[in-house]
Amino acid sequence: RYDFRFNQLTSQVECRERNSFNFYFLPVDKRLMASITMNAQYEGLKLWDKDVVRFLNSDHVPVYQPIEEFLYDLPRWNGKDYIGNLAKRVPCDHPYWTQLFRRWFLSMVAHWRGMGKNHANSTSPILIGPQAYRKSTFCRLILPPCLQAYYTDSIDFSRKRDAELYLNRFLLINMDAVSYTHLTLPTTSRV
C-alpha cells in the first residue's frame, strides 16, 4: 500500500501511498505513522506502532540518495559550458569570475558526493549589489527544481546546533541579507 525510502540527505524516512494521485514522497511524521498503523489494522494486520517504527528504522526501507539520483539521471555531457553560462548571468567585471565560479561549483558538487572529505570548500561566491538586484534569485537558479528542497536562505548561525544541522541538511545555503560592511574588496571583485 505504501512506498517507503530513507532519504540519506535529510536522515528521514519518506513515504507515498501507492495507487494515489499524490506522486510525491512525504516525511513520515507521527500523524502519518499513526495513519499507516491504523490503515494496516483496518486491513487485518495485527501490529502496533512499535512494529511500524521498527520496520521504518530497519534496512528493509531502501536508501534514497537525491544527489546521486539526480547526477546519474543527467544526460551525457554534450560539451556545452552550462556552468560558465550560469556564471555569465551575473554582471561582473572581474576577469576571472567565470573560472572562479566554475571551480567553486565543481567543488560544491564534489562535496555533495562526499569527495574530498579531508578538505572543506574554502571559497564562497559573495554577491554584492543593491537590493532587488536578483542576487537571491540567482542563488536559487544554481539548484535544479528537483533539488530545491535542499536550498535555504534562512539560517541562524547564532544557534550552533541549528547551524550544524543546516550545514548537513542543505546542499546550498544562501546567507542573504548578511552585512558585509567589514569587508573591503577591490571594485573589480564585487559582483
Positions of predicted regions on the chain:
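Conserved small/polar residues in nucleotide/adenosyl-binding loops
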Residues: 181-187
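P-loop NTPase catalytic core of nucleic-acid-dependent motor ATPases
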Residues: 55-172
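N-terminal nucleic-acid engagement/recognition segments and initiation subdomains in replication
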Residues: 1-88, 92-99
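Walker B catalytic acidic pair
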Residues: 176-177
